[in-house]
Amino acid sequence: MRKKPLTIFSDGTLTRRENTLYFESAKGRKPLAIEGIYDIYIYGHVNITSQALHYIAQKGILIHFFNHYGYYDGTFYPRETLLSGDLIIRQAEHYLNKEKRLFLAKSFVTGGTKNMERNLKNWGIKAKLSDYLDELNDARKITEIMNVEARIRQEYYAKWDENLPEEFKIVKRTRRPPKNEMNALISFLNSRLYATIITEIYNTQLAPTISYLHEPSERRFSLSLDLSEIFKPIIADRVANRLVKKGSLKKEHFREDLNGVLLTEEGMKIVTKAYNEELQKSVKHPKIGSNVTRQRLIRLEAYKLIKHLVGVEEYKPLVAWF
């Protein structure tokens, strides 16, 4: 049985009866095949009994919580079973050493830039985002790298806008709250991708709170933010572009709230379905020689980072060939 993500939009309670997980809601009690659950995404008001939580933890399943507006709140992160003290020391060493940290931070931005450029090419838009890479390579501080990355992304959104339907223009990237429909869609997808990457990191020996481009924080899994630089263009942005170009999302799938614009529940369901389908799309990997899914590419990227940290092979970010 291939494991799949479980997404809950309804209000209710997750319970356990013997060796079965149930979701109880106003619609009744529904059994959930826990062996088929990869991770859980909760958008509704959901209570979880301690028995259910223990069972979910035993199975090594992460639960990602999002608030009513679709913003990421946090993750239930079961006790890690793949911990490596040596790797954690190597991760910390690469953060504390300025040159090693700069190398990784620049690598994440380089990968993201080339993937954004690939998107624009696929969409028939001319742009030379890689012209910024010389300036990126000259950066000597993390803040300088972040500034270059911000300008690259600003130009990327401006170019992307040229190819978007009139009612779905980005205009300017806005967050918390997004000021228009396209910003709401991008924010929702980025939050979902952030959580997906957390799940993939959990299934490796990496510590999720030690990062290089983004400052480590007590309140976030910042390594997921680093890796998301590479995957936002080739997963989240491609889903967003396809949904609005094909007319799968319409104005009616958004609502005004919090002085901004947010997806309706129906809109979130449409986006989630498209996102999950995107994760399962496969492509032949040039190095491995076999087909791998988009989701597997995230795990492989984490493994590449591990090889770099332990000195086996220098890290090179994923640059999309598809």
From Swiss-Prot:
UniProt xrefs under CDD domains: Cas1_I-B (cd09722)
Keyword Repeat among UniProt keywords: no
One GO term of the biological process aspect: defense response to virus
Function: CRISPR (clustered regularly interspaced short palindromic repeat), is an adaptive immune system that provides protection against mobile genetic elements (viruses, transposable elements and conjugative plasmids). CRISPR clusters contain spacers, sequences complementary to antecedent mobile elements, and target invading nucleic acids. CRISPR clusters are transcribed and processed into CRISPR RNA (crRNA). Acts as a dsDNA endonuclease. Involved in the integration of spacer DNA into the CRISPR cassette.
NCBIfam families reported in the protein's UniProt record: cas1 (TIGR00287), cas1_HMARI (TIGR03641)
Sequence similarity: Belongs to the CRISPR-associated endonuclease Cas1 family.
Protein name as catalogued: CRISPR-associated endonuclease Cas1
Organism, scientific name: Pyrococcus horikoshii (strain ATCC 700860 / DSM 12428 / JCM 9974 / NBRC 100139 / OT-3)
